[in-house]
Every structure is written in C-alpha cells, then in structure tokens.
Design a protein with these regions (language model features):
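A compositional/biophysical signature of low hydrophobicity enriched in polar/charged and small residues
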Residues: 1-329
Length: 329
C-alpha cells in the first residue's frame, strides 16, 4: 500500500491524539503544514484504504466499572473455529487471537460483575470442550498505549501524554461518576466519529447537547482516565506491522516493577503488565510487541533479557486475528 511522507506523518499525529477543539483538523494541519480540508480528505482516504480501522474515542472500561481480564486455553483443532465463534459472539470480548503455542486461543473479556463474567465463560468452556481456562488478571499496568510508528524513526516512541498512565491506573481503582449525557457522548464516540469539518458539533447533535458540552465533558473524562484519547486506530497488518508477539517472562517479585517500566519504554511495546502466575504457568511479566518482522520482536526481547534477571521466557506470536474491536457500552 503506497503511503507518502505526509500520509505517514498524519497517521502518527492522529494516533497520538485528535485535539478536543471545534476545529481539530485545522490544529493538526497547522502542525503538519496542511490545510484543514486536505487533512480531512487524506484521513478519509486512509480509512477507505483500510490502514485506519476507526477514528473515535479510546476508552478505559475500568473507569466505567468494568473489569477486563486476559484468558488463554488449549482448544483442539477439530473444534477451534466453533469455539472461536462462541467466544467472538460475546460483546465483552474485544480481542481474540490464535497464537503459536500449546495455549492456542487468547482472548480478553470485560464484565461488570463476577456473575456476568461466569455467565459468559460457561458457554465458552463448553464450546471449547471444557479445557483448563487460564485467567490472567492484571496486577500492575506499566503501559497501555498502542502506537505504530509509521515514519520509520527508530527514536520515535509512543507520544503518551505525561501522567496519562497514572490517570488510567487511578480510573482502575476509582471508577468515574458519569451521568446519562456522558454515556450518550461515549456511545457516539465508541465507534467511528463523523469525519466532518466540525465533528464534535455532529456528535453534540446526536447526543442532544451543545458542542461545548461535548468538549468539556470529554476533557473531564480524559482527565479522570476514562477516556484515554480520541484518535485514529490503525489496522496492524495493513499498516505494515505483521509481527505481533506476546512476550511472557518470569521475574523476581522485587524486580518486576523496575523491569516492567524498562520494558514499557521500548517503542515496539504497546501493552505491558504484571499478571497472575500459576505453578504450571510461572510467567508474571507480559508485553505485546509489534514490528514489521518477527526478527525485530526477537531483537527487542534479546535486548531486554540481556539487561534483566529474567528466568524462563517465551514469545507467543499471533498467527490469526479471530476478533479485534474496540470496547463499547
């Protein structure tokens, strides 16, 4: 897929954060030397080509009272896709991948309560033939910020605003109070926002309020960690990032905090967590690593383990995207 230098710069800028202003495309255009209309036309073209999955709000479910967890299980090939269809049918499941490992199905599930969670997991277990289902809740979040560097600058990492991870962690502990108008605005932005010259005015019309109400409430939701950002979300493979590796490692408890922060600093890492371990699955440090080739993922892992007291480790490459969508109410 042919992208010029301005396309790539625009994709990087729009992944970072779309300004919460009446004229967001003008603000972006001034930074890149483009007219607002050209920003919008290029954005529409990149979405039509499939490089951009969607443009809208990236929300933190925990800030609205949902608990997200990672799950893995070994599913026999004869029932793999039947089980995947059941998993994917639940709204609370946003990601589901086949990975190159004995545990070949990995999915995420957000639910408001343990009762709701079990009502979903029961049918999933049954469809998969009742294998052991590993549950990996996060115990510490070091990074949660997908940024695919489209400009090929090795020094350019994810432009995460200062304090943003702290706000997300706070929202995990103290869910934000929201009213019905907040929820209407969230619903309008959890899919695709309107690609218009004044997009937030259209969001306001649909939500039944004024544009300034929308912008003010989005700023508040962002400051409390419920809204991570309004941004463009890319399709990894179409953007050239075909290698997607889940790195898991065994780290001493007294070292995992510092090691996790150092691992999170790699620009290729989008997610980095401390997660629950088990006697037969001792890994407690997890990171998602994205790159154009598996060799680069392996290079990042080598660089990390040469500097850290890592015990056992593994890299589970994804071989098939079974479901990938944004969380929604």
């Amino acid at each position: 897929m042919k992208l010029d230098a301005l396309d790539r710069a625009l994709l990087n800028r729009l992944q970072a954060r779309i300004p919460l202003t009446a004229e967001p495309w003008r603000t972006v255009g001034e930074e890149l030397g483009l007219a607002p209309g050209e920003v919008l036309e290029r954005l529409k073209g990149l979405k039509k080509q499939g490089v951009i999955r969607r443009v809208g709000g990236v929300f933190n479910p925990a800030g609205l009272g949902f608990a997200g967890r990672l799950y893995a299980m070994e599913v026999e090939e004869s029932r793999f896709y039947e089980a995947a269809a059941v998993v994917n049918g639940f709204k609370g499941v946003t990601h589901n991948y086949r990975r190159r490992h004995r545990l070949n199905m990995w999915f995420t599930l957000s639910a408001r309560s343990e009762e709701e969670r079990e009502a979903i997991l029961g049918p999933i277990r049954e469809a998969a033939g009742n294998p052991r289902l590993y549950e990996f809740p996060s115990e510490q979040v070091f990074k949660l910020n997908v940024f695919l560097n489209m400009e090929g600058n090795a020094e350019k990492g994810s432009p995460e605003p200062a304090g943003s991870q702290d706000r997300v962690n706070l929202a995990r502990r103290l869910p934000c109070e929201t009213d019905e108008l907040d929820l209407r605005i969230i619903r309008e932005l959890q899919g695709d926002m309107p690609l218009l010259p004044d997009p937030f005015a259209e969001v306001a019309d649909r939500a039944g309020c004024g544009r300034e109400d929308v912008l003010m409430r989005l700023e508040r939701l962002e400051s409390t960690g419920v809204l991570k950002r309004v941004a463009a979300v890319l399709r990894h493979r179409e953007a050239g990032f075909t290698a997607n590796g889940l790195f898991v490692a065994v780290m001493p408890q007294d070292k995992i905090g510092e090691a996790g922060r150092r691992l999170a600093a790699f620009k290729q890492v989008s997610h980095c967590y401390q997660r629950r371990s088990y006697p037969d699955w001792p890994y407690n440090l997890y990171a998602m690593i994205h790159a154009p080739e598996e060799a680069e993922v392996q290079r990042v892992v080598r660089e990390f383990i040469e500097q850290e007291p890592v015990g056992a480790y593994d890299i589970l490459f994804s071989t098939e995207e079974l479901k990938k969508t944004s969380w929604s109410l």
